[in-house]
Amino acid sequence: MNLNATLFAQMVVFLILAWFTMKFVWPPLINALDERSKKIADGLSAAEKGKAELEAAHKRVDQELAQARNDGQQRIADAEKRAVAVADEIKAQAQAEAARIIAQAKADAEQQVVKARETLRGEVAALAVKGAEQILKREVDQAAHADLLNQLKAEL
């Protein structure tokens, strides 16, 4: 093998090129790669953080929806309870009013019965007096007396 000066010159040039590359070219490349790596890592962590925030937001939305559903169901139940209470109150008032009307009607009917009895007593008394007058005006005869009683029965 023949070592000549060209080979040494090429080695020197290669070493200078390697030194120049390591001194001036390699650090910016390493810095660029490090920055890119850092940006990728930051992007991945931001993506994971965003994903976690999205999941948390979904959980909050689900909780708020569940709360809203529960509130709605509670309001419906309360409204139904109030409706039942109002219906019961109206029913009780209607029953009380019906009882009052029935009691008033019974009292009115009783008054009318009493009034009719008083009127009937007056008429019976008048008829008895009239019958007694007629009996006393005539002479006491069994046949006439029986006829007058039959007449009075017919009038009653």
From Swiss-Prot:
Transmembrane domains' residue ranges: 7-27
Family annotation (Gene3D superfamilies): 6.10.250.1580
Keywords on record: ATP synthesis, Cell inner membrane, Cell membrane, CF(0), Hydrogen ion transport, Ion transport, Membrane, Transmembrane, Transmembrane helix, Transport
GO cellular component: plasma membrane; proton-transporting ATP synthase complex
NCBIfam families noted in UniProt: ATP_synt_b, PRK05759.1-2
InterPro entries linked: ATP_synth_B-like_membr_sf, ATP_synth_b/b'su_bac/chlpt, ATP_synth_F0_bsu_bac, ATP_synthase_B_chain
GO MF annotations, alphabetized: proton-transporting ATP synthase activity, rotational mechanism; proton-transporting ATPase activity, rotational mechanism
Organism this protein belongs to: Paraburkholderia phytofirmans (strain DSM 17436 / LMG 22146 / PsJN) (Burkholderia phytofirmans)
Membrane-topology annotation of the record: Single-pass membrane protein
Known partners and oligomeric status: F-type ATPases have 2 components, F(1) - the catalytic core - and F(0) - the membrane proton channel. F(1) has five subunits: alpha(3), beta(3), gamma(1), delta(1), epsilon(1). F(0) has three main subunits: a(1), b(2) and c(10-14). The alpha and beta chains form an alternating ring which encloses part of the gamma chain. F(1) is attached to F(0) by a central stalk formed by the gamma and epsilon chains, while a peripheral stalk is formed by the delta and b chains.
Location within or outside the cell: Cell inner membrane
Domain of life the protein comes from: Bacteria
Pfam families according to UniProt: ATP-synt_B (PF00430)
Protein's recorded name: ATP synthase subunit b
Family note: Belongs to the ATPase B chain family.
Signal sequence annotation: none
